[in-house]
Design a protein with these regions (language model features):
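Conserved, well-structured interaction surfaces
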Residues: 73-144, 173, 191-196, 348-355, ...
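Membrane-proximal, proline-rich intrinsically disordered regions
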Residues: 9-56, 286-288, 304-308, 315, ...
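Short, surface-exposed recognition loops and adjoining beta-strand edges that mediate ligand/DNA contacts
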Residues: 24, 51-68, 145-153, 157, ...
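Extended ligand-binding clefts on enzyme/binding-domain cores
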Residues: 31, 220-221, 227-348, 353, ...
Length: 484
C-alpha cells in the first residue's frame, strides 16, 4: 500500500515507553523512536478518539446530524445528556492524555540520548512528536474549554509537557495558555521537520504541521497567520484538489492527492468493524449489525439540496426513514464505507477505511475565511471568493461567489457541505458565535437536557471532567466545568 502499518495498542503497551520509571531506556535509535510514534498513532484510531467518537461528536452537537430513535447509543452527544458521573465520554480525556504522555516520555528519552552524546539525528522524530502533541492539546481544549475568542481566560486542560511522576496532580491551565503551548509545539516542530511531503504516507510531516497552524490560527482569529499557513500549502503544489468528477471516488482511495494527514486503518489491528464510524453513519440494517444511529439532519440536507447536482450527494444514500416510509431521504453517509456500494478503500474489509484528518479542501476553506478578514495586501473579498470557488465547483448548479456576494455564512455553509462527517461543524459554530438548531422535530424525540437551539452561552457546550478523573487527581476537584 506504500504506507507504514501501525502497531497495535497492546503491542505498544508491551514494548514502548510508559510513564513508569522503567521506560527510560526503551528508545535508543531513530528506528525505536519511530516505533513509538507508530504506537501513538495507533492509539489515535481508538473508537474513543479519531476512530469514531471525535467526528461523531462534532457533527451531532453541531446540528448536521440527528437521530431516528433515542437510546441506541452515543445519542448523548446529540441530547447533551452529560454529567460528571454518566455519559462523560471520558475516553476523550484519557485517550488524549495517554497519547500526550507517551509523546512526552519519547521526547524526554530523546533529550537524554542527545545529552549523552548520541550521534543519531532525531530531528524528524521530535518534529513529528511535537506536531502530534499540538493536535492532541487542540482537540482537548476544544472539548473541555470554551472557544478562544469567547473566553480565553477560562479553564482549558492541564498543560503537561514532561513525563509525570506517580504522585503528580497537574491543574488546569487557561484556554489561552493551552493555545500558547499548541503554537509553541507547532513552531518548534516545524523547525525540525524537512520541508517536504513524507515518502511514507500517513506520518505527521511538515505540511501536516503547517495545516494545523492554519486551523489553530483560524480558531484564534489570527487571520493573517492562518492565511499565511494556508497559502504556503496551496502554493507549494505538493497537494492537488480533486476534480468534481473524482470527488466521490476519492473516499474509496487511500492517501489521495488532497490528503495532508490521514490515519491508516489496518484490517488486522485498528479496524473497528461493527463499532466503526462507517457502521454508525450508514443506513440502519443495511448490513447485519449496521448501526445507522445517526442520520443527516433536515437542515444539512436542505443545505446540500441547494444544488441537486452537487457531487457530494455521491456519498449519501437513503436512510432509515426511507425504509420505514418509502420516501426518499438521503441522510445516510458513506464516507467511511468507501462508497454507497460499501467498496471500502482497497482493504480486505470495508470498515477498515482510513481516517482523513486534514484535507486540502479544508485548507482552501480556511484561506477563504482568513482572506475575507485579513489585512494582508493579497487578501480581501476577491481573494476569498477565489479560494471558496475552488471548492464551490463541486456545486455546479450554484453561482460562483464574488467579492460582492461572499460572506462568512457562505463559507460556513460550504464547510458544512464539504466537511460533513468529519467532526468540524459544532466547533465552527461555536468559534463563530452562531446559534445551533437541532432537528428534534424530525422524529419528535423529546430532549430535556438542552433546548431546541443553543449558543455558546450554554454551559454544556464543554464536557464535564469525569468524577473518576477527579478522584484520581483531587487537584481538579475545584476546577470542574460550570453546570456539572
Amino acid at each position: 500500500l506504500g504506507a507504514f502499518t501501525f502497531t497495535s495498542c497492546d503491542d505498544f503497551l508491551d514494548m514502548q515507553p510508559t510513564n513508569s520509571g522503567n521506560a527510560e531506556g526503551a528508545v535508543g535509535t531513530v528506528a525505536d523512536a519511530q516505533v513509538v510514534i507508530n504506537g501513538v498513532m495507533s492509539a489515535m484510531t481508538s473508537s474513543s478518539y479519531y476512530g469514531r467518537n471525535l467526528f461523531m461528536y462534532g457533527d451531532a452537537k453541531g446540528g448536521d446530524l440527528t437521530i431516528f430513535a433515542a437510546g441506541r447509543g452515543l445519542d448523548a452527544f446529540y441530547t447533551f445528556n452529560h454529567t460528571s458521573n454518566s455519559n462523560t465520554y471520558s475516553g476523550f480525556w484519557s485517550r488524549g492524555y495517554y497519547c500526550i504522555l507517551q509523546v512526552n516520555t519519547l521526547l524526554s528519552n530523546i533529550e537524554k540520548l542527545e545529552e549523552s552524546g548520541s550521534m543519531e539525528d532525531f530531528s524528524e522524530a521530535k518534529g513529528q512528536a511535537l506536531t502530534l502533541r499540538a493536535l492532541f492539546y487542540f482537540d482537548l481544549v476544544r472539548l473541555y474549554g470554551l472557544p478562544y475568542n469567547y473566553n480565553k481566560t477560562s479553564y482549558g486542560v492541564p498543560n503537561v509537557t514532561e513525563p509525570l511522576t506517580v504522585n503528580a496532580q497537574p491543574t488546569r491551565a487557561t484556554v489561552e495558555e493551552n493555545y500558547r503551548q499548541i503554537l509553541q509545539d507547532l513552531s518548534d516542530g516545524a523547525a525540525l521537520l524537512a520541508k517536504k511531503k513524507t515518502k511514507q504516507s500517513g506520518y505527521a510531516d511538515y505540511y501536516t504541521n503547517i495545516a494545523l497552524q492554519a486551523r489553530v490560527k483560524l480558531y484564534m482569529e489570527d487571520y493573517d497567520g492562518a492565511l499565511n499557513a494556508a497559502r504556503e500549502i496551496i502554493e507549494s503544489g505538493v497537494y492537488k484538489l480533486y476534480e468534481p468528477a473524482d470527488w466521490t471516488a476519492s473516499w474509496s482511495k487511500q492517501f489521495g492527492s488532497e490528503s495532508i494527514f490521514e490515519l491508516g486503518i489496518t484490517t488486522e489491528e485498528s479496524d473497528l468493524g461493527t463499532s466503526s464510524l462507517g457502521f454508525y453513519l450508514m443506513r440502519y440494517g443495511q448490513l447485519k449489525n449496521a448501526m445507522g444511529w445517526y442520520l443527516a439532519s433536515d437542515y444539512f440536507l436542505n443545505r446540500l439540496g441547494e444544488d441537486e447536482t452537487d457531487v457530494r450527494w455521491g456519498i449519501m444514500d437513503n436512510d432509515e426513514y426511507w425504509v420505514d416510509n418509502e420516501i426518499e431521504r438521503k441522510g445516510a453517509c458513506y464516507k467511511y464505507m468507501g462508497s454507497t456500494t460499501l467498496a471500502g478503500d482497497g482493504k480486505a474489509t470495508n470498515t477498515a477505511v482510513n481516517i482523513k484528518i486534514i484535507r486540502l479542501s479544508e485548507i482552501y476553506l480556511i484561506a477563504a475565511e482568513a482572506a475575507l478578514h485579513s489585512t494582508k495586501q493579497e487578501a480581501g473579498a476577491d481573494a476569498a471568493a477565489g479560494y471558496l470557488n475552488e471548492i464551490r465547483r463541486r456545486s455546479p448548479g450554484l453561482a460562483p461567489a464574488t467579492a460582492a456576494t461572499i460572506t462568512d455564512d457562505m463559507i460556513l455553509d460550504e464547510r458544512s457541505k464539504e466537511l460533513f462527517g468529519e467532526g468540524q461543524r459544532f466547533f465552527d459554530m461555536m468559534r463563530m458565535g452562531r446559534t445551533i438548531e437541532f432537528n428534534d422535530d424530525f422524529q419528535d424525540i423529546p430532549v430535556s437536557h438542552r433546548g431546541k437551539t443553543i449558543d455558546r452561552t450554554f454551559e454544556k457546550i464543554v464536557l464535564p471532567i469525569s468524577q473518576d478523573e477527579i478522584n484520581a487527581n483531587p487537584a481538579l476537584e475545584n476546577q470542574q466545568n460550570p453546570g456539572y
